């Protein structure tokens, strides 16, 4: 996404490392299996249409979902995972790769959802899934597969999503309209030793929810709590203006153009995947997967900026806001508040060719694997940004776009001034890796591996310098071919980089007794910036990025309890970010590089105290902190905005996390379950000035296996019906602790908890 958000996403990812690090040992005697369980990855309190983000204490890596061993998308901006992948009936398997496995096979650190497409099987088989909720969601997923004779097999899939969201918006009846189609043909050969599959996938998605649910107004009380602003209901009232049209200046051509927000967020993908596997007589197994994807990726943001109180003493006579009524007549706006928003229209044409091949050999006490990645990614990307102002209605009605007649005669202004982006070119990664999973004795298991990667980046961006050697930066009506105030012409600047990346991982488990033992692992990654980091109007820090992760602890297993307790450390150097700092009505970009580190302790337990009852418990204490987080910028009125967050707790990240997951089999066919997640106090800006109190995310439901073909379930999201804000507060980066002490009962905007939702699902085996 735009670099406006990069610092925020880095902060959001920094500290939840310990929440998930121990699950592998707590749930599986084979501590070095590639996947781990009990992560409830599809229980997402932030979204109804994708897997939850499992945070590991660092900025999110792009490769967070794999299908058939390859990334669903090489880069998630502008082509997000949810627009081309869903956890639907087309998948034969979904799991969660461990951190070490993700690091070795993809070069990124973090968990990755690991999925495989359903291939054809003997006879005729089918699955029809249906999902709905009380807001009107209609989701259908169908897989049909079978054999054609002579070892030929087929599989076809269809996914349709009609999701109106949790509130109505004027621009479209759906906040998510996604359709995905897959068709596979498989041939088994040489006595079933080999298997070749060709797959075609087409996806078409409008991810309106990305901007529709981005923010909402509330009253910040001052003690970490919030209350509703008038009749505006968080999560069930729209904060989008009625008007769906957006005027922008094309970053490539400089022309003023118009589009609808719905059209701007169109994502399309056309993919061909070839998969082959073969089992040799000597026990050697070979597999290879090649994917080509031609797509249009798009992400739209409507980012809230400053809020102005038009009726305050300081603003009397300063503004003259107008709007147009339903008849097109110009009228004076007499509301109390207006909010400035920045529209970011991110889009790019993408071609990617991804190839992975592996050789695996099992020995009596170990398994050895040798693999290779050849991943090529080409993109022509830009982000067109536009500023506009809107009303902040207290009566729960739809917001109106307004304009200040003292300054302009139309809604839109400052085209491409604040967060516009451009880059074009290719990135290539060629990597070799190996892993060895070795039972040294019946008490000691070792897992180790390494990856060597050559990263090549070639293309152009708009990081233009003037005659003095300083970056020109963005300005109003900025675009390729524009001329800055100092006479510098904005022409694409060439980019060419070649880097050697590497990582290694080692894990050990020692069984002191049959039930008790020690476990630990260490993963170290050296990376360099990805192509998307070059999107802003300045070059990023291109020094190496180091990511060490170390964990050590104990485990205990018996017939009814599996328990692990671990201490952990994780850090990352040279995070690139751009803060869009606000002072009055002015917004300025401040590029920076900083480090993050997290220490913590976690205990994870899975218990089966009596027949039919299971209980999962997770407790984490952690301290995520910023390092070298300093920047400053001078505004036009001479005010200097300084930020020094070094040593501060990372914004938006709790220090205490708790997960409670009880379930009970009422009968052999009916399961009752709940899931509770507690997140303690979080800071809402990097200066620790604003904060939100802790909250619970809750889920519960009943699963009923009616017969061997039909399964029904009912799930309640947020059954405690907690409402409130979370994340960060718009435009608050420069607010200090001392300034915040006097701020009480003030209107602000930010993200919010997913509202109470009742979901119904049915799955039919055909």
Predicted regions mapped to residue ranges:
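C-terminal beta-barrel architecture of Gram-negative outer-membrane proteins
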Residues: 164, 626, 651-705, 720-737
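Acidic, small-polar-rich N-terminal luminal/periplasmic segments of exported/outer-membrane proteins
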Residues: 19, 27-123
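Acidic/polar loop-and-plug regions of large Gram-negative outer-membrane beta-barrel proteins
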Residues: 173, 186, 195-273, 298-344, ...
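Structural signature of Gram-negative outer-membrane beta-barrels, strongest in the C-terminal barrel
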Residues: 350, 367-377, 382-386, 390-408, ...
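C-terminal beta-signal and adjacent terminal beta-strands/loops
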Residues: 2, 27, 680-683, 704-766
């Amino acid at each position: 996404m735009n670099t406006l958000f990069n610092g925020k996403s880095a902060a959001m990812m920094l500290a939840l490392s310990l929440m998930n690090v121990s699950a592998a040992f707590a749930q599986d005697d084979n501590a070095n299996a590639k996947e781990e369980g009990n992560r409830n990855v599809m229980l997402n309190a932030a979204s109804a249409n994708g897997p939850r983000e499992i945070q590991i204490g660092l900025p999110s890596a792009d490769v967070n979902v794999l299908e058939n061993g390859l990334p669903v998308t090489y880069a998630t901006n502008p082509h997000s995972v949810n627009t081309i992948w869903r956890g639907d009936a087309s998948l034969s398997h979904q799991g969660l790769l461990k951190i070490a496995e993700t690091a070795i096979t993809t070069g990124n650190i973090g968990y990755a959802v690991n999925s495989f497409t359903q291939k054809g099987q003997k006879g005729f088989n089918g699955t029809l899934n249906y999902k709905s909720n009380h807001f009107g969601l209609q989701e259908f997923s169908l897989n049909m597969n079978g054999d054609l004779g002579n070892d030929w097999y087929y599989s076809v899939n269809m996914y349709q999503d009609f999701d109106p969201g949790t509130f109505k918006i004027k621009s479209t009846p759906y906040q998510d309209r996604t359709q995905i189609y897959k068709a596979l043909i498989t041939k088994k050969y040489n006595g079933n030793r080999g298997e070749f599959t060709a797959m075609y996938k087409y996806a078409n998605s409008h991810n309106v929810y990305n901007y529709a649910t981005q923010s909402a107004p509330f009253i910040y009380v001052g003690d970490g709590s919030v209350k509703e602003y008038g009749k505006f209901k968080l999560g069930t009232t729209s904060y989008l203006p009625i008007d769906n049209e957006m005027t922008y200046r094309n970053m490539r051509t400089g022309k003023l153009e118009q589009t609808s927000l719905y059209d701007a967020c169109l994502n399309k993908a056309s993919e061909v995947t070839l998969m082959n596997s073969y089992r040799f007589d000597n026990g050697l197994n070979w597999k290879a997967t090649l994917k080509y994807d031609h797509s249009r990726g798009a992400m739209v943001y409507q980012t809230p900026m400053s809020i102005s109180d038009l009726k305050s003493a300081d603003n009397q006579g300063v503004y003259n806001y107008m709007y147009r009524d339903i008849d097109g007549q110009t009228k004076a706006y007499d509301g109390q508040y207006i909010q400035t928003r920045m529209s970011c229209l991110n889009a790019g044409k993408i071609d990617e060719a991804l190839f992975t091949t592996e050789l695996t050999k099992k020995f009596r006490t170990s398994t050895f694997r040798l693999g290779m990645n050849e991943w090529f990614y080409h993109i022509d990307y830009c982000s067109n940004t536009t500023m506009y102002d809107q009303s902040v209605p207290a009566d729960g009605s739809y917001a109106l776009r307004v304009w200040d007649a003292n300054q302009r005669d139309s809604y839109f202004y400052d085209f491409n001034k604040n967060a516009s982006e451009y880059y074009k070119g290719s990135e290539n990664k060629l990597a070799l890796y190996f892993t060895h999973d070795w039972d040294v004795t019946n008490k000691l298991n070792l897992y180790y591996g390494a990856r060597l990667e050559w990263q090549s980046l070639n293309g152009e961006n708009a990081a233009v310098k003037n005659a003095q050697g300083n970056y020109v930066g963005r300005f109003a009506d900025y675009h390729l071919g524009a001329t800055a105030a100092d006479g510098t012409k904005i022409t694409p600047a060439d980019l060419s980089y070649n880097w050697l990346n590497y990582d290694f991982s080692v894990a050990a488990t020692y069984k002191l007794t049959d039930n008790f033992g020690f476990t630990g692992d260490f993963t170290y990654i050296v990376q360099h910036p990805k192509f998307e980091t070059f999107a802003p109007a300045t070059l990023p820090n291109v020094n190496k990025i180091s990511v060490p992760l170390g964990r050590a602890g104990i485990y205990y297993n018996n017939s009814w309890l599996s328990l692990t307790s671990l201490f952990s450390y994780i850090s990352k150097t040279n995070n690139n970010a751009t803060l869009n700092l606000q002072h009055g009505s002015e917004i300025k970009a401040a590029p920076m590089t900083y480090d993050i580190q997290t220490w913590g302790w976690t205990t994870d337990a899975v218990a089966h105290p009596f027949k039919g009852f299971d209980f999962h418990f997770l407790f984490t204490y952690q301290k995520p902190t910023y390092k070298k987080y300093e920047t400053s910028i001078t505004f036009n009125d001479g005010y200097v905005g300084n930020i020094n967050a070094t040593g501060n707790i990372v914004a938006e990240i709790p220090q205490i996390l708790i997960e409670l997951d009880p379930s009970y089999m009422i009968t052999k066919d009916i399961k009752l379950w709940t899931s509770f997640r507690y997140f303690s106090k979080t800071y809402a800006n990097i200066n620790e000035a604003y904060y939100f109190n802790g909250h619970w995310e809750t889920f519960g439901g009943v699963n009923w296996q009616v017969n061997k073909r039909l399964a029904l379930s009912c799930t309640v999201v947020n059954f405690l019906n907690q409402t409130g804000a979370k994340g960060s507060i718009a435009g608050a980066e420069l607010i200090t602790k001392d300034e915040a002490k006097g701020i009480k009962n003030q209107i602000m905007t930010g993200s919010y908890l997913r509202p109470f939702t009742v979901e119904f699902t049915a799955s039919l085996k055909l």
